[in-house]
Amino acid sequence: MARVTVEDAVNVVGNRFDLILMASRRARQLATQGKTPLVDPENDKPTVIALREIEENLITNELMDIQDRQEKHEKQTAELAAVAAIAEGRG
């Protein structure tokens, strides 16, 4: 399954090097950041799930960049709100 997925995913991405970078980034999101898979996991490991998502054009570097920026913005907004609440409590 994984070998066919790699070959098919390379056709989507263009070359193996970009595929490796994209798949490892997505697999890390799935494994450690609690991201929800966009395909049925079927008891596959995060790397295979990432390859399947790439193969089906469900995830791209651009999409992951946008998601990362949104999450960073939300985190910063929450931190600023917490600081403002603390400052108001002291003032």
Curated annotation (Swiss-Prot):
Family annotation (Pfam families): RNA_pol_Rpb6
UniProt catalytic activity: RNA(n) + a ribonucleoside 5'-triphosphate = RNA(n+1) + diphosphate
Molecular-function GO terms, alphabetical: DNA binding; DNA-directed RNA polymerase activity
SMART domains recorded: RNA_pol_Rpb6
One CC-aspect GO term: DNA-directed RNA polymerase complex
Biological processes per GO annotation: DNA-templated transcription
Keywords: DNA-directed RNA polymerase, Nucleotidyltransferase, Transcription, Transferase
Entry EC no(s): 2.7.7.6
InterPro entries assigned: DNA-dir_RNA_pol_omega, Pol_omega/Rpo6/RPB6, RPB6/omega-like_sf
Subunit structure: The RNAP catalytic core consists of 2 alpha, 1 beta, 1 beta' and 1 omega subunit. When a sigma factor is associated with the core the holoenzyme is formed, which can initiate transcription.
Similarity field: Belongs to the RNA polymerase subunit omega family.
Function: Promotes RNA polymerase assembly. Latches the N- and C-terminal regions of the beta' subunit thereby facilitating its interaction with the beta and alpha subunits.
Record protein name field: DNA-directed RNA polymerase subunit omega
